[in-house]
Amino acid sequence: MFQLTFLGTGATVPSARRGLSALLVEHETDRFLVDCGEGTLRQIRQGGVGVRRLDRILLTHGHLDHILGLASLVGTLDLWDQADRLTLYGSEEALHIARVLLDQVVWPDDHPGLDVIYATLKPGRFCETGGVAVTAFPVCHHETQSFGFRFEETEHRPLDGARLDALGVPEGRERHELAHAGAVTLADGRTVRREDALGPAERGTSLAVVGDCGDADALVESVRGVDLLVIEATYRTADEATARSRSHLTVADACRLAQAAGVGRLVLTHQSDRYDPAEVEAEARARFEPVMVAKDFDRVEVRPAVRS
């Protein structure tokens, strides 16, 4: 299961209702921050998610409304000694801007105690932890080098209740020990190993995150089948001409992609403050369900979607 915290859901400039792009993705002890718009540090503190174990930041692209918050956030991580190492993932273009921002603004005169690693992205899998694999895929937005991200839980085999019963493993302490230690010795002297009681492999939960985008149709295969898709929908469908001229998506674009790719749930973000969120959500629900329009500090659990 993934836990999402929407720290900034606005477009271009912050407003009274919305901060700029930032999404915290958590899975067990792993934490990934996708984009870091202006004011992200304040949003982190106000949202109560903290900065501990925040050692990976993924940049969709190098536009300032997605990256400017790096100065205060990374500077604070260094000042508070909250991490020994921080990895910034992004295109060459985005990382160049990030490096200039940090080297010339945050640390112009001294070397930070924080070890910052600049990891240049290419399409494909780029990060694997014990339980999560993250893949980058190209996204069209103006002339920028832009990426979206697909997060997938590692396939796992849980303990099977029927097998545990057949092996005579009582509920309670013995099953807990078997799950965590890998083996348990029963009262009759038999030793049961974890692999003897595993059920069939289960698909892990998946989600995709797309920042600014000018061509949703090109993303169908990249996001196909995910349990949840987070994607920008900066404009109402009535303003399609403006969306096209600015290389952004409409509500209809995002919903069409979700339908074509067979995603389980849809969350719309990067919202223009000109619209009433209730009207945006009503338009989206007429085109795809289940769907929600994210607000700052919304928290969403991502579990395997129930599909018809």
From Swiss-Prot:
Name assigned to this protein: Ribonuclease Z
TM stretches of this protein: none
Cofactor binding summary note: Binds 2 Zn(2+) ions.
Record-annotated active site: 65 (proton acceptor)
Species this chain originates from: Rhodospirillum centenum (strain ATCC 51521 / SW)
Cofactor(s) demanded: Zn(2+)
Family assignment from sequence similarity: Belongs to the RNase Z family.
Gene: rnz
EC category name: hydrolase
UniProt: Zn(2+) 2 binding residues: 65-66, 212, 270
This protein's UniProt keywords: Endonuclease, Hydrolase, Metal-binding, Nuclease, tRNA processing, Zinc
EC number: 3.1.26.11
Function: Zinc phosphodiesterase, which displays some tRNA 3'-processing endonuclease activity. Probably involved in tRNA maturation, by removing a 3'-trailer from precursor tRNA.
HAMAP family, per the entry: RNase_Z_BN (MF_01818)
GO molecular function (one): 3'-tRNA processing endoribonuclease activity
UniProt subunit comment: Homodimer.
Residues binding Zn(2+) 1: 61, 63, 142, 212
Catalytic activity, reaction form: Endonucleolytic cleavage of RNA, removing extra 3' nucleotides from tRNA precursor, generating 3' termini of tRNAs. A 3'-hydroxy group is left at the tRNA terminus and a 5'-phosphoryl group is left at the trailer molecule
